[in-house]
From Swiss-Prot:
Location(s) in or outside the cell: Photoreceptor outer segment membrane; Endoplasmic reticulum membrane
Gene: GUCY2D
UniProt keyword terms in alphabetical order: Cell projection, cGMP biosynthesis, Cone-rod dystrophy, Congenital stationary night blindness, Disease variant, Disulfide bond, Endoplasmic reticulum, Glycoprotein, GTP-binding, Leber congenital amaurosis, Lyase, Membrane, Nucleotide-binding, Sensory transduction, Signal, Transmembrane, Transmembrane helix, Vision
A Pfam family this chain is assigned to: PK_Tyr_Ser-Thr
Side of membrane Cytoplasmic, spans: 488-1103
Protein name (database record): Retinal guanylyl cyclase 1
Effect of V933A: In CACD1; uncertain significance
GO cellular component: endoplasmic reticulum membrane; nuclear outer membrane; photoreceptor disc membrane; photoreceptor outer segment; photoreceptor outer segment membrane; plasma membrane
Organism: Homo sapiens (Human)
N-terminal signal peptide: 1-51
Disease: Leber congenital amaurosis 1: A severe dystrophy of the retina, typically becoming evident in the first years of life. Visual function is usually poor and often accompanied by nystagmus, sluggish or near-absent pupillary responses, photophobia, high hyperopia and keratoconus. Cone-rod dystrophy 6: An inherited retinal dystrophy characterized by retinal pigment deposits visible on fundus examination, predominantly in the macular region, and initial loss of cone photoreceptors followed by rod degeneration. This leads to decreased visual acuity and sensitivity in the central visual field, followed by loss of peripheral vision. Severe loss of vision occurs earlier than in retinitis pigmentosa, due to cone photoreceptors degenerating at a higher rate than rod photoreceptors.
Effect of E925K: Changes the substrate specificity from GTP to ATP
Positions annotated with a glycan in the UniProt record: N297
Effect on the protein of changing V902L: In LCA1; increases basal and GUCA1A-induced guanylate cyclase activity; inhibition by RD3 is less effective; does not affect endoplasmic reticulum membrane localization
Domain of life from the UniProt record: Eukaryota
Length: 1103
């Protein structure tokens, strides 16, 4: 592209470029002469007739940041271009097209994306990464391309650059000035884009004179990283406002969620600080309940968000970004399937930037008489343009103000509290008061000098106060010069015997725990000789850590541990001892036990007299005892993460002591205590210094106490009493062996302590513990061996040891709580699987129960009984009932064993149940050999009930013809069947074992039809015959004649003998002799052996 084309904003312009753009090179001019008339005609055409295309590039992190991508920049840019192309006022101008350009989230890639984007477009909206803003401005000015960098916090309107709205830095500064909050801190998300935004914003605020205390990044990107960032803010210089440079939680920003939850945990949302989101300045949030959907599920986040003031662009009261999106969708300018609730309000910002850039191009060309103009001219018209934005007017002197939103701690909606116009400097109330945490007021303002460009602010102090302070300091210095000696001694004495920092404790300060759990100002009962006989090295042993130990007391509400000095008579505490103890008390580290004071018992009465004349060091007490106690508790599972966490705590504690010039000298697992959070702390440090200052001789060491002692110290008792740094490293190695092997020092050597100490003191051979390579990482074992090297100079320093041990875990943090949480998570997962398995089994059993219940009762009735709903009786106008009975069942029962009768009925009714499954019938009940079925209830089926019962009866009769009893196959099984149709009432009777029963004369009549029937016959009443004939399905009935029915009199009844299309064989009814019963079996059909059994059961009946 030529230079003239670049000046034209990336488009070729015949007027600017001249013939060189239109014609071939000069040597080819003769070949072009025949076409000269056509060329002259083209040159005479007006520029608007060229139908040129102006391409607007939209550059942003659309591909690498999901929240930015939710703004749907493609739809926003195309919507703006489409509206401009349809604008009648721009007819004859260029056609606007858009190109969506991805900007990498990493800063180096962002710079490259800007360079490539400027080579492809005529105007550019972007970039978003502030690190690329200034390079983009310079490159755009060189290329002559108009630039609208909407995402840059601090952009100057010059050259080809034209900010779409007020830069974020100006808006934030105007807000801070309105409230007088000068001391601010910035917390950014760890991504490059936000880190660069924080740097650019802090630079802009500092350039305006504000004291930005810190710019902190959240790393790692979780709740712990948020806590660490806020701790830095809290522990740094005092601030009033915290600017959160990250995605807003209202748009789903997890970083801001973590930050606000951490602020709530740390108590920073109590009203002393105000939190200001940075990204909301770039788009328009509207008051209303939709904006707080992200807070609905977290009461902690709602409380924390009460400390947030949200500055955002203002839409007119009659609309919002969401309303504008709905109107565009209704006009079919946006896809109908687009979920508008999921579209970020950044949509409107992108639309406005594209629209403003394109209108600036159009107005610049119109002002130039239709000719193409430079990017600088386009930028000037953009700055002065007055155009309709997506939800309000843009540009010119009527720049839309900002609105300050707040919540009321309930989280149900956002309220507009103030309207802010940075250009005019106006800050007007919107009618709703701001709500601060706990109903308090806003943080107080900082000195006004911070916002006065003509005044130098000296840390926020007025010059008069500074002068008075100087005079006060000078006066105090002069007074101190005369009274230094006296005040020093008085203050030292008062500090040691009284006040919150006293170190001399008496029996009035310590409450000793009673051996049996009660509290008193006494020690445990026992002889003074037994207390004095305890070795100092045994003080931290396992039994002494229990609550019944006389060495445990309560001081200022906390349990403390008392370790006595050797000897029984200590008249006073020597000044050197006080000085040495004061230095030890100043040691503060999470892995070093805190020294609280020196206890001297004088004038004690009663059982407290046991401590009379005893001097003891009072230190904090840890509930889990010593490391030796913890390793002895086999019920506590110690994985490598657990062990490495304990060892890392130990290394950090020793490292701290060495940095402070303190050699422990007595380091062993009994002197390492573990608190309730499984944090290891070192105690008994500096004990040799205290003994030396108090001029007390230590007790002779026992061999059991010297297992951790370095060989050079064993050879020099004086050196052993003082201790050395290299000797602590050796002791560390022995403790590492204890933890790794979970055994006593040198336990695998099977030697007595005396033998071990002698061999360590006097090699060769070299005596060291034996540790298997599979008990810990190889690096740990190698470090252990380096630490117990024979030559002290070969042992690593504690700094080097710390670095080596950290590398064992590849830099991962080793925390016991994390290890325990992982174990709990495994247990929770196993429990969830077990619950899921049991739930599935329960659901399966429930299905079985439901299936069994629906087999016993109709489904509707069963469901009502399960829910406890009363089952009302139901009247059925027309049903057909079926009754059947086994002929001669009493005789068969007499000839059979009870189990054979049960098998007979089970086989027969299983056969019947299989048959009725293919018919629309309901099995009511079976009583003995009686079988009752109904159709037309509980589900009505019109007139089909008679046909269903008739078909079922024919199928049952056909199946009975081939049925044989297992125990008497030669005896035929005959049944009588009776059918009757009529009305009845159905309902559930009883609460215990409820039954679905039928009531009415129809039931009695059907039973009479069965009892008056004949074997292998289907006895049918006239009412049923009438329905069958009305159905006209070819049922074949024969008139039986007049039949006497009990309680009914004589009626005409019929036999059902078949149906058209029914081809199954039906058994032939037996011929009944005159006078014979239809309820029995003839003797000729009974086998002889069964007949004899029957005669025994009924003597004289068959003679």
């Amino acid at each position: 592209m030529t230079a003239c084309a670049r000046r034209a904003g990336g488009l070729p312009d015949p007027g600017l470029c001249g013939p060189a753009w239109w014609a071939p090179s000069l040597p080819r001019l003769p070949r072009a002469l025949p076409r000269l008339p056509l060329l002259l005609l083209l040159l005479l055409l007006q520029p608007p007739a060229l139908s040129a295309v102006f391409t607007v590039g939209v550059l942003g992190p659309w591909a690498c940041d999901p929240i930015f991508s939710r703004a749907r920049p493609d739809l926003a840019a195309r919507l703006a271009a489409a509206r401009l192309n349809r604008d009648p006022g721009l007819a004859g101008g260029p056609r606007f097209e858009v190109a969506l350009l991805p900007e990498p989230c990493r800063t180096p890639g962002s710079l490259g994306a800007v360079s490539s984007a400027l080579a492809r477009v005529s105007g550019l909206v972007g970039p978003v990464n502030p690190a690329a803003c200034r390079p983009a401005e310079l490159l755009a000015e060189e290329a002559g391309i108009a630039l609208v960098p909407w995402g840059c916090p601090w952009t100057q309107a010059e050259g080809t650059t034209a900010p779409a709205v007020t830069p974020a830095a100006d808006a934030l500064y105007a807000l801070l000035r309105a409230f007088g909050w000068a001391r601010v801190a910035l917390v950014t998300a760890p991504q490059d884009l936000w880190v660069e935004a924080g740097r650019s914003l802090s630079t802009a605020l500092r350039a305006r004179g504000l004291p930005v205390a810190s710019v902190t990044s959240m790393e790692p990107l979780d709740l712990s990283g948020a806590r660490e960032a806020l701790r830095k803010v809290r522990d740094g210089p005092r601030v009033t406002a915290v600017i959160m440079v990250m995605h807003s939680v209202l748009l789903g920003g997890e970083e801001q969620r973590y930050l606000l939850e951490a602020a709530e945990e740390l108590g920073l949302t109590d009203g002393s600080l105000v939190f200001l989101p940075f990204d909301t300045i770039h788009y328009a949030l509207s008051p209303g309940p939709e904006a707080l959907a992200a807070l609905a599920n977290s009461s902690q986040l709602r409380r924390a968000h009460d400390a947030v003031l949200t500055l955002t662009r203002h839409c007119p009261s009659e609309g919002s970004v969401l309303d504008s999106l709905r109107r565009a969708q209704e006009r079919r300018e946006l896809p109908s399937d687009l979920n508008l609730q999921q579209v970020s309000p950044l949509f409107g910002t992108i639309y406005d930037a594209v629209f403003l850039l394109a209108r600036g191009v159009a107005e610049a060309r119109a002002a130039a008489g239709g000719r193409w103009v430079s990017g600088a001219a386009v930028a000037r018209h953009i700055r002065d343009a007055q155009v309709p934005g997506f939800c309000g007017d843009l540009g010119g002197d009527e720049e839309p103000p900002f609105v300050l939103l707040d919540t009321d701690a309930a989280g149900d909606r956002l309220f507009a509290t103030y309207m802010l116009d940075p250009a005019r400097g106006s800050f007007l109330s919107a009618g709703t008061r701001m709500h601060f945490p706990r109903g308090g007021s806003a943080p107080g303002p900082d000195p006004s000098c911070w916002f006065d460009p003509n005044n130098i602010c000296g840390g926020g102090l007025e010059p008069g106060l500074v002068f008075l302070g100087f005079l006060l300091v000078v006066g105090m210095g002069l007074a101190g010069a005369f009274l230094a000696h006296y005040v020093r001694h008085r203050l030292l004495h008062m500090q040691m015997v009284s006040g919150p920092n006293k170190i001399i404790l008496t029996v009035d300060d310590i409450t000793f725990l009673h051996p049996h759990g009660g509290t008193s100002r006494k020690v445990a009962q026992g002889s003074r000789s037994s207390l004095g006989a305890r070795s100092m090295s045994d003080i931290r042993s396992g039994p002494s850590q229990h609550l019944d130990s006389p060495n445990i007391g309560v001081y200022e509400g906390d349990r403390v541990w008392l370790k006595k000095f050797p000897g029984d008579q200590h008249i006073a505490i020597r000044p050197a001892t006080k000085t040495a103890f004061s230095k030890l008390q100043e040691l503060r580290h999470e892995n070093v036990a805190l020294y609280l004071g020196l206890f001297l018992a004088r004038g004690a009465e009663g059982p407290a007299a046991l401590w009379e004349g005893n001097l003891a060091v009072v230190s904090e007490h840890c509930t889990r005892g010593s490391l030796q106690d913890l390793l002895a508790q086999r019920e506590i599972k110690l994985d490598w993460m657990f062990k490495s966490s304990l060892l890392l705590d130990l290394i950090k504690g020793i490292r701290y002591l060495h940095h402070r010039g303190v050699a422990h000298g007595r380091l062993k697992s009994r002197n390492c205590i573990v608190d309730g959070r499984f944090v290891l702390k070192i105690t008994d440090h500096g004990h040799g210094r205290l003994l030396e200052a108090q001029k007390v001789l230590p007790e002779p060491p026992r061999a059991e106490d010297q297992l951790w002692t370095a060989p050079e110290l064993l050879r020099d008792p004086a050196l052993e009493r003082r201790g050395t740094l290299a000797g602590d490293v050796f002791s560390l190695a022995i403790i590492m062996q204890e933890v790794v092997c979970r055994s006593a020092p040198y336990a695998m050597l099977e030697l007595t302590p005396e033998e071990v100490v002698q061999r360590v003191r006097s090699p060769p051979p070299l005596c060291r513990p034996l540790v298997s390579m599979d008990q810990a990482p190889v690096e740990c074992i190698l470090l252990m061996k380096q630490c117990w090297a024979e030559q002290p100079e070969l042992r690593p320093s504690m700094d080097h040891t710390f670095d080596l041990f950290k590398n064992i875990n590849k830099g991962r943090k080793t925390n016991i709580i994390d290890s325990m949480l992982r174990m709990l998570e495994q247990y929770s997962s196993n429990l969830e699987d077990l619950i899921r398995e049991r739930t599935e089994e329960l659901e399966l059993e429930k299905q079985k129960t439901d299936r069994l219940l629906t087999q016993m009762l109709p489904p509707s009735v069963a469901e009502a009984l399960k829910t406890g709903t009363p089952v009302e009786p139901e009247y059925f106008e027309q049903v057909t009932l079926y009754f059947s009975d086994i002929v001669g069942f009493t005789t068969i029962s007499a000839m059979s064993e009870p189990i054979e009768v049960v098998d007979l009925l089970n086989d027969l009714y299983t056969l019947f149940d299989a048959i009725i499954g293919s018919h629309d019938v309901y099995k009511v009940e079976t009583i003995g050999d009686a079988y009752m079925v109904a159709s037309g209830l509980p589900q009505r089926n019109g007139q089909r009930h008679a046909a269903e019962i008739a078909n079922m009866s024919l199928d049952i009769l056909s199946a009975v013809g081939t049925f044989r009893m297992r125990h008497m196959p030669e005896v035929p099984v005959r049944i009588r069947i009776g059918l009757h149709s009529g009305p009845c009432v159905a309902g559930v009777v009883g609460l215990t074992m409820p039954r679905y029963c039928l009531f009415g004369d129809t039931v009695n009549t059907a039973s009479r039809m069965e009892s008056t029937g004949l074997p292998y016959r289907i006895h049918v009443n006239l009412s049923t015959v009438g329905i069958l004939r009305a159905l006209d399905s070819g049922y074949q009935v024969e008139l039986r004649g007049r039949t006497e029915l009990k309680g009914k009199g004589a009626e005409d009844t019929f036999w059902l003998v078949g149906r058209r299309g029914f081809n199954k064989p039906i058994p032939k009814p037996p011929d009944l002799q005159p006078g014979s019963s239809n309820h029995g079996i003839s003797l000729q059909e009974i086998p002889p052996e069964r007949r004899r059994k029957l005669e025994k059961a009924r003597p004289g009946q068959f003679s």
